[in-house]
Amino acid sequence: MANILKKLYNTDKRELKKFEKYATKVEEHADEMSKLSDEQLQAKTPEFRERIKNGESLDDLLPEAFAVAREGAKRVLGLYPFHVQILGGIALHFGNIAEMMTGEGKTLTATMPVYLNALEGKGVHVVTVNEYLSSRDEEEMGQLYRWLGLTVGLNINSMSPDEKREAYNCDVTYSTNSELGFDYLRDNMVVYKEQMVQRPLNYAIIDEVDSILIDEARTPLIISGEAEQANSDYIRADRFVKTLTEDKSDDDADDDEDHGDYKIDWPTKTISLTRTGIEKACEHFGLKNLYDVENQKLVHHIDQALRANYIMLKDIDYVVQDGEVLIVDSFTGRVMEGRRYSDGLHQAIEAKEGVKIQEESRTQATITYQNFFRMYKKLSGMTGTGKTEEEEFREIYNMQVITIPTNRPIARKDMPDILYPTLDSKFHAVIEEIKKRHAKGQPVLVGTVAIESSERLSHLLDEANIPHAVLNAKNHAKEAQIIMNAGQRGAVTIATNMAGRGTDIKLGPGVKELGGLAVIGTERHESRRIDNQLRGRSGRQGDPGYTRFYLSLEDDLMKRFGGDRVKDFLDRLSDNDDEKVIESRLITRQVESAQKRVEGNNYDTRKQTLQYDDVMRIQREIIYGERMQVIEADKSLKNVLIPMIHRTINSQVDMFTQGDRSQWRLDSLRDFISSSLASEQVTDSIDFKTISVEDLKKKLYDIVEKNFEDKEKALGDPSQMLEFEKVVILRVVDDRWTDHIDAMDQLRQSIGLRGYGQLNPLVEYQDSGYRMFEEMISNIEFDVTRLFMKAEIRQNLSR
């Protein structure tokens, strides 16, 4: 481990040394650029573009282009990037993650690599976590790019396809990660090329890169259509699971008896029925075997009802507002508008909460952020907290995390954690600490892990008559404004999981003298990175600051990992029950060790998700690629259709003519020909008693050829024939692909059970997925054959 850390440290040092050489060259151009008139500085953009056309690389242009962007920022924005910001910009240009502390000016840092890479004219995407930040940065930084002669676009959810296309055609496009992903999926569902909005994915700079590529890595982007689903099934399953009791016995208990109906494994958050639970289900629903094939849907509903009732927690995983279940992002604490849990879980929660059950949706297209962002030709990112996830960034995205030095030394005091035996004693201590600091006017930012905690704290502060602002998933409309005021004298702000990232907390007048912003964490998050984000809100740009975490043995992390060890430690250190309060670096280390275990588990899960998703990625690329060839075709697709139809004929004829002639299934063969290829009259004219297999195939090929000629004559215009061919292929491919996505999703859900048979679930998924894909291709070819051969020719077809 020590060797790995040493190697990473040396990589940082080596890369920074390389970047320093470039940064020195950038600064050498500073005087030259400052002497240019506005017109001369602006003329550099067309000059650079001409030099790129003549073969000069972006790396060659870097020193001059960065110097131009830097001088432009001084004139347009009144901001002049520091040396460390130049280093950050260079790290971004070379496809790395620049780890820069809060307040070090990440937004300004990005202007230099954005300008340089936009000169190619292939498009640069600046990616943010929400539309407020996209709009803000496009408005503020867009002034600089436009002044330098670049086009700048903003891509937001409410735009029409034409507006989106215009935004994507700009040199620089600001967008959220979700909008980019959804636009990609929608582009691969269009039936006319003109309906597409995106260009090929060239270069992206992701702001808060850890939030998008780590925290949301497993979140699939899904475009759905509604599917029929009886709501009563969810209610029946919900009523049943509410009668069950939990088996809380240890896994290593000596007896084989069940001590309840279901068992939860909290570290992995999995839940399953025990044998007793299975027997109860059979009795409740009047079944002999719960896991019979015909009970598959019921089992699925019971599984989701168990998760909804006993794993998913109200006000932590979701909130209920105005009779609607809304998902809460566990990392940002924000409500995820418009998002629904898939696979019936959302409906199961709606049944649990007794609100209206909405229709289950059917997935039409899906991709994870992991696979979407890996499609960019070059990818880079910025964050204040990326080093803890360096291995994951390197392994999955091939990106180094480069820690950029701060412009001024850090003056913030990070104090050791304090541990209390109960939640009540902890919250009492937190309120006392806030009172003490508030009395002298020092601003306090209190970080919570769940909405529940923020509401409890808010209630306690109300009782103490301390005015405060609450920032959580239930109140994010004024998020930026609340955060901007959090550094003012006397301000007390409660934030869930550091909602409000991307907005700086600037200290108000006289606050430095009071010790700067005091940050109090009321619980450790399972990720050290989220804790570091909270800490990093204090002490920006060398300001003073103070941070401390208050913990209790009843905290979720303590209960899940290492609680007993810490409790024993607590008992040994204190005999007085009322005074069991410990401030110790040992506690901090114990907590960090628990966090590392969780982070390791989470990384393994994300890595596994990617391995499974890679199966779909390969299949998606094949289907989307073939689909695009059909859409872009400008001459007849006969050379695509004829081989498809021939393969269908071969497989069907071979299937029905196995063995000697007496074993041929002639009725089935006739049915295939009359239903998929020819009229009954033509079918009846074939002498099946004497014809050989090869002659039959040849005769059917001739029927196909004649059908083609008849259709071409009937339509007359080759462009109409091409349109007909496109309609046939696209309709079939889209229908079958949607079915396949659904089937792959069900396979993914069920594949874990095969692990019990000493089989590797991933290998099983890959093998089964490949077979299902092959089967889908055969089905596509069969459907295309029938639709093309049997469809009536009409003018004015619509795709």
Curated annotation (Swiss-Prot):
The lineage of its organism: Bacteria, Bacillati, Bacillota, Bacilli, Lactobacillales. The gene is secA. This is Protein translocase subunit SecA. It is a peripheral membrane protein. Its main location: membrane. It catalyses: ATP + H2O + cellular proteinSide 1 = ADP + phosphate + cellular proteinSide 2. Belongs to the SecA family. ATP binds at Q85, G103, E104, G105, K106, T107, D504. It comes from Lactobacillus acidophilus (strain ATCC 700396 / NCK56 / N2 / NCFM). InterPro entries: Helicase_ATP-bd, Helicase_C-like, P-loop_NTPase, SecA, SecA_CS, SecA_DEAD, SecA_motor_DEAD, SecA_preprotein_X-link_dom. Monomer and homodimer. Part of the essential Sec protein translocation apparatus which comprises SecA, SecYEG and auxiliary proteins SecDF. Other proteins may also be involved.
